[in-house]
């Protein structure tokens, strides 16, 4: 009966996403191509001193993104350091500099890596004015970058790729806020907490004292999932009953996680005026998502050991109210996107099951990926796939009528190399430098192969702006706070700059006519080429470290 209920829920989720992505994708395309501004948007532009009709070159667009994000880091860092003097601080003290630095970068980069216990560290004001605000604007920034890249394919001999301030404002006001508001009301109806109380001291049934935390949880939970942010109001994240009370709210959160990433391919298709192109990208995302979901489920349900046999499945670290099937679906969704929220502890998965959560991020989080980042990551894979196909037949590669020249390929290759470089260099430094290694060894709760997996997972999560963790690693040390903070910063903004530069290169190119030798990029063959290109790139880079960590652990 449990399996029947889960499969029925999975079918309903797929149907709901299929319907929603069609309408939301079309709506987002209208939002970013409209010439009209709402009154609220006009007021925002006046306050910011922005001319909404002025286009920006890719360099100007990049400067705006970096300046806005820098201000966000400074503001969020200051809020944490000044917390004792802020309202609704609940008596919490100032957050230490290393954790404040790490947290500020984490939320501005859409990572939401948490090297602290939220309910024990932060008051309501920092949660609302700091973290919740960044959940909105960091998600909007990612979507804006994806739209800027699409304009690179659409533009013909131009120099501008849109206006960052307009894209940011429209995305926040017209897309994220309305959906998040509806989702918050649904979560409240399901039992999620939404109040402004502090800690409630009560006497338990057995007569002992108990402290029950409260706060504006549902409102932050909604945008945390919708914006693929992932940072929890509580340390238990979405496994906490105040954030995610019931099985149906769990499915709702999975729906929110996947909604925008799976809708953006249609936005892409509508903006390039060929929805078949969007369908090909969407199909590649769905194939990778489904294959990894099935593989992870198979690994978890085949868990070994006496406890697993008695429970019917390896239930350590999983919530009884969700069960193994929903836990696996949530884990696959949160690591296939850049969300990082958890309703079960990934560190407690079987060795091979945990490897698939790691592998999902190593793919570059492209199926469907984070809001914005998933689409532009998949489009880079598509550009590389077109180049490989061009080499096979001896033709100059083209994609959507644009020739892919040396400049475009260099930018695409650099984009692909950023994340693996950050992950492997971060792990190597942590283990090769004696002083750092001794610090890391004290942070690893499970030495050996699993300890290596915990460290690799941390740097992979940070560099991909995911934010989930193998919780056996204590990441609050000065070295890991600084190193993971740097990985989050570089893993977010170096790819963004490369994507904007790629858009700038494409928008200047004139379209070339379609000929009999042009590679069709809207059929099943091209979708297959994209899938295998993504797998090939990941296998070449990460297979050695996977053999030393989760594969070795799983075979022992």
Curated annotation (Swiss-Prot):
What keywords were assigned to this record?
A: Cell membrane, Ion transport, Membrane, Potassium, Potassium transport, Transmembrane, Transmembrane helix, Transport
Q: In the record, which residues are listed under signal peptide? A: none
| Membrane-crossing segments per the record | 1-21, 60-80, 130-150, 173-193, 245-265, 281-301, 374-394, 416-436, 482-502, 529-549
NCBIfam families xref list: kdpA
Protein name, per record: Potassium-transporting ATPase potassium-binding subunit
Listed GO MF terms: P-type potassium transmembrane transporter activity; potassium ion binding
User: What are the GO cellular component annotations?
Assistant: plasma membrane
Membrane topology label: Multi-pass membrane protein
Chain's role: Part of the high-affinity ATP-driven potassium transport (or Kdp) system, which catalyzes the hydrolysis of ATP coupled with the electrogenic transport of potassium into the cytoplasm. This subunit binds the extracellular potassium ions and delivers the ions to the membrane domain of KdpB through an intramembrane tunnel.
From which domain of life does this come?
A: Bacteria
Q: Which residues are connected by disulfide bridges in this protein?
A: none
> Which family, according to UniProt?
Belongs to the KdpA family.
The listed locations are: Cell membrane
What do we know about how this protein assembles, alone or with others? The system is composed of three essential subunits: KdpA, KdpB and KdpC.
Q: Give the species this sequence originates from.
A: Cutibacterium acnes (strain DSM 16379 / KPA171202)
């Amino acid at each position: 009966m449990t399996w029947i209920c889960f499969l029925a829920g999975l079918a309903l989720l797929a149907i709901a996403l299929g319907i929603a992505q069609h309408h939301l994708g079309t709506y987002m395309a209208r939002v970013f191509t409209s010439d009209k501004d709402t009154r609220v948007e006009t007021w925002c532009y006046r306050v910011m001193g922005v001319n909404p009709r002025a286009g920006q070159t890719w360099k100007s667009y990049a400067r705006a993104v970096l300046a806005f994000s820098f201000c966000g880091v400074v503001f969020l860092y200051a809020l944490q350091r000044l917390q004792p003097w802020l309202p609704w601080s609940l008596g919490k003290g100032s957050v230490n500099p290393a954790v404040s630095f790490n947290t500020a970068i984490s939320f501005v980069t859409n990572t939401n890596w948490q090297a602290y216990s939220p309910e024990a560290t932060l008051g309501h004001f920092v949660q609302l004015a700091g973290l919740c605000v960044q959940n909105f604007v960091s998600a909007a920034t990612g979507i804006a970058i994806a739209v800027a890249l699409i304009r690179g394919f659409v533009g013909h001999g131009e120099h501008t790729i849109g206006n960052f301030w307009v894209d940011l404002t429209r995305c926040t006001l017209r897309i994220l806020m309305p959906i998040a508001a509806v989702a918050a009301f649904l979560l409240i109806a399901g039992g999620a907490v939404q109040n402004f109380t502090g800690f409630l001291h009560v006497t338990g049934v057995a007569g002992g004292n108990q402290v029950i935390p409260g706060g504006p949880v549902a409102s932050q939970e909604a945008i945390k999932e919708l914006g693929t942010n992932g940072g929890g109001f509580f340390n238990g994240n979405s496994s906490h009953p105040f954030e995610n009370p019931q099985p149906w709210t769990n499915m709702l959160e999975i729906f929110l996680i996947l909604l925008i990433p799976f809708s953006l391919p249609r936005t892409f298709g509508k903006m390039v005026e060929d929805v078949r192109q969007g369908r090909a990208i969407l199909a590649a995302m769905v194939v990778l998502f489904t294959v990894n979901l099935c593989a992870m489920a198979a690994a978890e349900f085949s868990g070994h050991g006496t406890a697993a046999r008695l429970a019917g499945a390896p239930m350590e670290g999983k919530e009884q109210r969700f069960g193994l099937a929903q836990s696996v679906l949530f884990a696959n969704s949160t690591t296939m996107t850049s969300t990082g929220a958890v309703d079960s502890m990934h560190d407690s998965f079987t060795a091979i099951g945990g490897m698939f959560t790691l592998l999902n991020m190593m793919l570059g989080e492209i199926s469907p990926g984070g809001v914005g980042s998933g689409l532009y990551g998949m489009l880079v894979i598509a550009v590389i796939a077109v180049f490989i196909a061009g080499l096979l037949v001896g033709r100059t590669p083209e994609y959507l009528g644009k020739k892919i020249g040396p400049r475009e390929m260099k930018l695409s290759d650099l984009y692909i190399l950023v994340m693996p470089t950050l992950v492997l260099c971060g792990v190597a430094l942590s283990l090769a430098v004696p002083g750092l290694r001794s610090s890391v060894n004290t942070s690893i709760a499970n030495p050996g192969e699993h300890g290596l997996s915990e460290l690799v997972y941390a740097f992979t999560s940070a560099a991909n702006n995911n934010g989930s963790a193998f919780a056996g690693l204590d990441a609050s040390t000065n070295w890991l706070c600084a190193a993971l903070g740097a990985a989050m910063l570089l893993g977010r903004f170096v790819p963004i700059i490369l994507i904007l530069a790629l858009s700038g290169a494409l928008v200047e190119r004139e379209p070339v006519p379609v000929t009999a030798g042009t590679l069709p990029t809207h059929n099943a063959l091209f979708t297959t080429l994209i899938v295998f290109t993504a797998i090939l790139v990941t296998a070449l880079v990460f297979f050695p470290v996977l053999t030393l960590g989760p594969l070795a652990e799983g075979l022992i």
